[in-house]
Amino acid sequence: MSLSNEEMISNIRQKLNIVNQALLNPEKFKSTPHQDISEIYEFVMSKDSFSPSEVTAIADHLGQLRQDMED
């Protein structure tokens, strides 16, 4: 079963132990292409730990994919 973008973002946020969780609000990724989120999700879930610079880079990339437009 394939996870939704929102489920993948929630799992990524938890795995990376993001302090400011509002930055990765799963609701903001509903219309992001599934493949983009899936690639990041697979990478994050494949690693046991991350350096601070890796967490920052992943969060920055996800921030670029985030859809901040109002409905």
UniProtKB/Swiss-Prot annotation:
InterPro entries linked to this entry: UPF0435
Pfam families listed in its UniProt record: DUF1128
Family to which this protein belongs: Belongs to the UPF0435 family.
Protein name (database record): UPF0435 protein SE_1565
UniProt source species: Staphylococcus epidermidis (strain ATCC 12228 / FDA PCI 1200)
